[in-house]
Amino acid sequence: MIDADPTLRPEPLPEDNDRALRPQGLGEFIGQAEARANLRVFIESARRRGEAMDHTLFHGPPGLGKTTLAQIVARELGVNFRMTSGPVLAKAGDLAAILTNLEARDVLFIDEIHRLNPAVEEVLYPAMEDFELDLVIGEGPAARTVRIELQPFTLVGATTRMGLLTTPLRDRFGIPTRLQFYTIDELFEIVSRNARKLGAPADDAGAREIARRARGTPRIAGRLLRRVVDFAVVEGDGTITRELADGALTRLGVDQLGLDGADRRYLRLVAENYGGGPVGIETMSAALSESRDALEEVIEPYLLQQGLIQRTPRGRMLAQKAWTHLGIAPPKSQSDLFG
């Protein structure tokens, strides 16, 4: 099994629910400039017209702020916020219970909307389009359809797997918004602000050191910051410097690129056992005793984004940057390839 460090994975952990660190409005939200600018227009238009905002879909890698933005949309509209997730809505009745309790213009947020039960999804279509709910009462010959009028509402969906959404559902979102990985400068701002809120101010070099290793993801930056704060309080004077951040993150196994032990084992396997590749994903899966899905969804996205590996029709290959990072000279054939 790959021993992936949960601190460096963008999936939510209980410690991420620190409301004090979450931005409360669009003005406080750092990053995603294009998405924020567009949302500001859509929100203001809905407020001036006194109507529900059009249905909105946030998509992109985990940990970039989809849930936070959904909460901000409701707060800026001045309406109630209801939250659920695709796997929780097992039956049409589960969705009906939520929809019938919404007030006018409320925001309903469905996380992991790509995991909706198809039967539930069918019920959602008329609710999104016409604000009506068609429910089947009874069974067999005695079954009948009852139509329930709903208050106009805004559905905000979030997904990390846009390709798994059915076309009919995807087409019903009037405002599709892709969230991008954050730049180091944006993460630097986030880390600096949150360090002050945690009572352990960071100097510029210290905040930037954490930002550089946060894998372009605010959720990961927040986790790394908390761990560095622990070191600053116990082994320092409560201030985060570059030296303290570097020492703490190195002890936590987070290297200069933000890679953990699982990432480095993946790269070393391709380098040392397969000469840099190409090597098939099934072979990688067997060699690392890990499922193909785990490799493709947990390990590889960041390695691809950083230009450390390449996916080719023949399999995975290391890029020149990976050889440099590992401190290993590429084989002669690959050296010629890279020039």
From Swiss-Prot:
Query: Which keywords annotate this record?
Result: ATP-binding, Cytoplasm, DNA damage, DNA recombination, DNA repair, DNA-binding, Hydrolase, Nucleotide-binding
Q: SMART domains from the entry?
A: AAA
Name the residues that bind DNA: 292, 311, 316
Q: Does the keyword Transcription apply?
A: no
Q: Write out the ranges of the annotated region (Small ATPAse domain (RuvB-S)).
A: 183-253
Q: What is its EC number?
A: 3.6.4.-
According to the UniProt record, what class of enzyme is this?
hydrolase
Q: Which residues bind ATP?
A: 21-22, 63, 66-68, 129-131, 172, 182, 219
- Tree of life domain: Bacteria
Q: What does this protein do?
A: The RuvA-RuvB-RuvC complex processes Holliday junction (HJ) DNA during genetic recombination and DNA repair, while the RuvA-RuvB complex plays an important role in the rescue of blocked DNA replication forks via replication fork reversal (RFR). RuvA specifically binds to HJ cruciform DNA, conferring on it an open structure. The RuvB hexamer acts as an ATP-dependent pump, pulling dsDNA into and through the RuvAB complex. RuvB forms 2 homohexamers on either side of HJ DNA bound by 1 or 2 RuvA tetramers; 4 subunits per hexamer contact DNA at a time.
| Subunit architecture | Homohexamer. Forms an RuvA(8)-RuvB(12)-Holliday junction (HJ) complex. HJ DNA is sandwiched between 2 RuvA tetramers; dsDNA enters through RuvA and exits via RuvB. An RuvB hexamer assembles on each DNA strand where it exits the tetramer. Each RuvB hexamer is contacted by two RuvA subunits (via domain III) on 2 adjacent RuvB subunits; this complex drives branch migration. In the full resolvosome a probable DNA-RuvA(4)-RuvB(12)-RuvC(2) complex forms which resolves the HJ.
Q: Which protein is depicted?
A: Holliday junction branch migration complex subunit RuvB
Taxonomic lineage is: Bacteria, Pseudomonadati, Pseudomonadota, Alphaproteobacteria, Rhodobacterales
Q: Which gene encodes it?
A: ruvB
